[in-house]
């Protein structure tokens, strides 16, 4: 590490210590991040991603408890004949069918090599570059685990699960576990026998088009009071709709430079719903829901951190952890359709023998 880099890096460590009310020398020992610092970090992370701004990132004080129930569940309009002594009954619109959450520890550990710090030290925004590098990767990992996580292993294996499948139970797996009746992954006949292990869309398939599939799923897997909700969207995998339907609609910033424009909205609607593409969503699936129906809960005093140098490997190591849970606020407000295969499934015409053959 160059002398200029050392000076700026020490100033960064002093700033981290100041924000968390500890001595600069204690940054290399595990410390609890101040809740206000965690809140600022989570807000900044949310603002760094268009997708994360559209969902809920919620601090909770307990490791486990009842969902907050963000958004109204069902209708609340009613009539009551009070003249006959009947009292009006208010509806608890936060009452949910499956209403529990449980935050578990997720680690965000990484290192920065000395030569990278030496490069960043040439710029005035040295501390900002370190912070932004952390926030960008954490933002992407929150999204990746949310859409691909199927379990929480005691010790995760990134080589076997490159999409963070074993880090946490994400939103899609929550649907599979908690609301399997709202998940479509195969085709059955009227007697419940499986006729296809995948959902075929196209000529000769189970559905003539993606529009027909979305309309059928919406009508049969989502509760009636949500079917006409103006905030419903279809989060669609990249294999299902051609790239030409997804021009970038965010004109305020350059998508090639900023993570914030990571939600791409199609000009084409599917089943009369806006089609949305987000990072790391499974390529052969669709999630029909309101984006505000998806939440990340984090325990606000669970944030732990330690920053230490490892000169034997010429790098600075940052160990960070937080207890979080991926939450679907109301399963009735959405459904998951997966194992979708688009193509031509019509029976090939039999070859005819040529005359004289």
Curated annotation (Swiss-Prot):
Keyword Phosphoprotein included in the entry's annotation: no
Localisation: Virion
GO cellular component, one term: viral capsid
Source organism superkingdom: Viruses
One Pfam family hit: Phage_cap_P2
Record flagged with keyword Iron: no
UniProt PTM: N*, H1 and H2 all derive from full-length N protein by N-terminal processing.
Propeptide feature: residues: 1-9
Alphabetic keyword roster: Capsid protein, Late protein, Virion
Function: P2 proheads and capsids consist primarily of N*, a 36.7 kDa protein and two minor components, H1 (39 kDa) and H2 (38.6 kDa).
Family the entry assigns: Belongs to the P2-like viruses major capsid protein family.
Name the record gives this protein: Capsid proteins
């Amino acid at each position: 590490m160059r002398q200029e880099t050392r000076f700026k890096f020490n100033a960064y460590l002093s700033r981290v210590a100041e924000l968390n009310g500890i001595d600069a020398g204690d940054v290399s020992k595990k410390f609890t991040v101040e809740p206000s610092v965690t809140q600022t970090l989570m807000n900044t992370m949310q603002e760094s991603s268009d997708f994360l701004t559209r969902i809920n990132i919620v601090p909770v004080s307990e490791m486990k408890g009842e969902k907050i129930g963000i958004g109204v569940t069902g209708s609340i309009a009613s009539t009551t004949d009070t003249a006959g002594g009947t009292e009006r009954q208010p509806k608890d619109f936060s009452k949910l069918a499956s209403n529990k959450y449980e935050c578990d520890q997720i680690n965000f550990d990484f290192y920065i090599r000395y030569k990278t710090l030496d490069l960043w030290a040439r710029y005035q925004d040295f501390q900002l570059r370190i912070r932004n590098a952390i926030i960008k990767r954490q933002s992407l990992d929150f999204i990746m685990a949310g859409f691909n996580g199927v379990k929480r292993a005691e010790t995760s294996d990134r080589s076997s699960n490159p999409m963070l499948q074993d880090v946490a139970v994400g939103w899609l797996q929550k649907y599979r576990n908690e609301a399997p009746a709202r998940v479509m992954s195969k085709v059955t006949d009227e007697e419940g026998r499986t006729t296809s292990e995948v959902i075929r869309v196209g000529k000769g398939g189970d559905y003539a088009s993606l529009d027909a599939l979305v309309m059928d799923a919406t009508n049969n897997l989502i509760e009636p009071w949500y079917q006409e909700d103006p905030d419903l969207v279809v989060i669609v995998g990249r294999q299902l709709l051609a790239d030409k339907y997804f021009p970038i609609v965010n004109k305020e910033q350059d998508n090639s430079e900023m993570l914030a424009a990571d939600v791409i909205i199609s000009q084409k609607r599917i089943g009369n719903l806006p089609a949305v593409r987000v990072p790391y969503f499974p390529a052969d699936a669709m999630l029909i829901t309101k984006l505000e129906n998806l939440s990340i809960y984090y325990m606000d005093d669970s944030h732990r951190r330690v920053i230490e140098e490892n000169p034997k490997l010429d790098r600075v190591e940052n160990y960070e952890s937080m207890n979080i849970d991926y939450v679907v606020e109301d399963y009735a407000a959405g459904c998951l359709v997966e194992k979708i295969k688009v193509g031509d499934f019509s029976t090939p015409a039999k070859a005819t023998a040529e005359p004289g053959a």
